[in-house]
Amino acid sequence: MSMQDPIADMLTRIRNGQSANKVAVTMPSSKLKVAIANVLKEEGFIEDFKVEGDAKPVLELALKYFQGKAVVESIQRISRPGLRIYKKKDELPKVMAGLGIAVISTSKGVMTDRAARQAGLGGEIICYVA
C-alpha cells in the first residue's frame, strides 16, 4: 500500500519514537524529509540525522532528550495533501509566541518561520514544532 502523506508519517515516527524513549527512528528518505531534518537539527530539536543506502535510501534521525524528557513537546502537520496552507511573509505564524518554530517550504528552500521573515519570503507551512 502506498503512503498518502510521507511528511505526516515522518512527524508521527518522531512523535512515537520520543514517547517510547527511542534513541533513533528510521524512515524512507526524500529530499524534503532531509531538508526538514536539517531544520530540526539546526534548531536543536534532534541530535543528528544521516541518510544510508543507494537504491532505497533510509533516513535515520537521532532523537534528543533533556533530563530524560523529550525535547519535542509537540509536532503537528499543518499543510497536508488534501488542504495546502500557504501564507505570505506578513502572515507567517509565531508558534507558542516565538518559543516554537514553523517549518516553511519557500522558493529558497525549507526554513524556519524566523528565517523566512528575515528573507522576506512566504510559502507553504509544513508543520509546527514546539
UniProtKB/Swiss-Prot annotation:
GO molecular function annotations of the record: rRNA binding; structural constituent of ribosome
Gene3D superfamilies for this protein: 3.30.1370.30, 3.30.1490.10
PROSITE patterns: RIBOSOMAL_S8
Keywords associated with the record: Ribonucleoprotein, Ribosomal protein, RNA-binding, rRNA-binding
GO cellular component, one term: ribonucleoprotein complex
Source domain of life: Bacteria
A GO BP annotation: translation
PANTHER family reported in the protein's UniProt record: 40S RIBOSOMAL PROTEIN S15A (PTHR11758)
Quaternary state and interactors: Part of the 30S ribosomal subunit. Contacts proteins S5 and S12.
Role of this protein: One of the primary rRNA binding proteins, it binds directly to 16S rRNA central domain where it helps coordinate assembly of the platform of the 30S subunit.
Annotated family: Belongs to the universal ribosomal protein uS8 family.
NCBIfam families for the chain: PRK00136.1 (NF001109)
Name of the featured protein: Small ribosomal subunit protein uS8
Organism per entry: Yersinia enterocolitica serotype O:8 / biotype 1B (strain NCTC 13174 / 8081)
Gene responsible for this protein: rpsH
